[in-house]
């Protein structure tokens, strides 16, 4: 087995009440001015003020950038960077789901390294550590609060840039399920399927290790048991907490084993049409699993067993097929759209989408490597 590296934030706070603990632990850190990166909903709902008040109690001032939209853009990064500089912020707090986390990562990275966001597209392109970042999570899915992945939309090229860089790994991650109770069903479903995709892609990645395998399988098990409950009753705290742990486990898996064609393709859909990332993943997942099954059927069956399917006595091919069907059934049961047509994607755009997907960093570790025609066919199979 080749050598491997395991990336994770220095400190990871989990469970009810972990938000207050994490911010109290900043006492004595020397930080004076925080930039809180969030979105308008988090600000209007009072969660940004809650965090700002907790910071103030520790003697830390804060400025707020709440202009992050789903699929954060280069423009958003520049806007946040200006506020950071104007307020002499010495560290960054991201508050929300994947979009605020990714935007904050890019702000923190460019703040210390200079240049433009696009300079860091690819793997480990930065020279210096980013500004310290605390990522406070309010969704259970992206795991961006604890990864070295940062996805920013280039509005000019209409593509999502994948920045995979150890220097954007947050210093502290916070997963307090009390902050996740307010997630609507649609967001719970989309982010939960994103987490399941992380588990599947990490487990079948060419860079998988025994550590990432263990994380991926446990994540799949917990998601299968708790996602629908969390969707049906958002106030079910055991389900919310289980999903918080599950998405974190899936994050540990893909942060170190990387991903595959589902994400490489979903990034293009999100960047080109401004579609929700988790929904794109959910629609594409069964199609890419079917494509990969010719080389990793046994691994797909393993995930199915972890999800609680009675398939241990089946052959690898049959077990993989049953697992893929279970994924389809779960997605349908929580209201995920059936195909790309329902998302508004267009078949005539597929050649361009496929070309960009093959250049995405996430494509490198897919277990089955395809050419332009095969990836086009994969996209078309999802219509």
From Swiss-Prot:
Its EC number is 1.1.1.1. GO terms for molecular function: ethanol dehydrogenase (NAD+) activity; metal ion binding. InterPro entries: ADH_Fe/GldA, ADH_Fe_C, ADH_Fe_CS, Alcohol_dehydrogenase_Fe. It is an enzyme of class 1 (oxidoreductase). It holds the Pfam family Fe-ADH. Fe(2+) binds at residues 194, 198, 263, 277. It comes from the Bacteria. Keywords: Iron, NAD, Oxidoreductase. Iron-dependent alcohol dehydrogenase involved in the formation of ethanol from pyruvate. PANTHER family: ALCOHOL DEHYDROGENASE, ALCOHOL DEHYDROGENASE 4. In Z.mobilis there are two isozymes of alcohol dehydrogenase. This is Alcohol dehydrogenase 2. It comes from Zymomonas mobilis subsp. mobilis (strain ATCC 31821 / ZM4 / CP4).
């Amino acid at each position: 087995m080749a050598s491997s590296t395991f990336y994770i934030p220095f400190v990871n706070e989990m469970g009810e009440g972990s938000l207050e603990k994490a911010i109290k632990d900043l006492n004595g850190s020397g930080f004076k001015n925080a930039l809180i990166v969030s979105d308008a909903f988090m600000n209007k709902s009072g969660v940004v003020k809650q965090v700002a008040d907790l910071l103030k109690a520790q003697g830390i001032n804060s400025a707020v950038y709440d202009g992050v939209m789903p699929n954060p853009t280069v423009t958003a990064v520049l806007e946040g960077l200006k506020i950071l500089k104007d307020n002499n912020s010495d560290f960054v707090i991201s508050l929300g789901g994947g979009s605020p986390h990714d935007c904050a990562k890019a702000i923190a990275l460019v703040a210390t390294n200079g240049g433009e966001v696009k300079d860091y597209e690819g793997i480990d392109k930065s020279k210096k550590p980013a500004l310290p970042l605390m990522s406070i999570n309010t969704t259970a899915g992206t795991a961006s609060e604890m990864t070295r992945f940062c996805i920013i939309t280039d509005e000019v090229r209409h593509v999502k840039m994948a920045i995979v860089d150890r220097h954007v790994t947050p210093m502290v991650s916070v997963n307090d399920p009390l902050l996740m109770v307010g997630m609507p069903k649609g967001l719970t479903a989309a982010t939960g399927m994103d987490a399941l995709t992380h588990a599947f892609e990490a487990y079948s990645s060419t860079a998988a290790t025994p550590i990432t395998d263990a994380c991926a399988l446990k994540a799949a098990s917990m998601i299968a048991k708790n996602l629908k409950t969390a969707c049906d009753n958002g106030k079910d705290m055991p389900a919310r907490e289980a999903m918080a742990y599950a998405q974190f486990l899936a994050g540990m898996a893909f942060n170190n084993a990387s991903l595959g064609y589902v994400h490489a393709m979903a990034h293009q859909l999100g960047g080109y049409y401004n579609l929700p990332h988790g929904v794109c993943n959910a629609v594409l997942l069964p199609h890419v699993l079917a494509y990969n099954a010719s080389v990793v059927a046994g691994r797909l069956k393993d995930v199915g067993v972890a999800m609680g399917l009675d398939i241990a006595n089946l052959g690898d091919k049959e077990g993989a097929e049953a697992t893929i069907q279970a994924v389809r059934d779960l997605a349908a049961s929580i209201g995920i759209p059936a195909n790309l047509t329902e998302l508004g994607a267009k078949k005539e755009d597929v050649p361009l989408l496929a070309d960009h997907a093959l250049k995405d960093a996430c494509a490198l570790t897919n277990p089955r490597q395809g050419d332009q025609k095969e990836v086009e066919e994969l996209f078309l199979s999802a219509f």
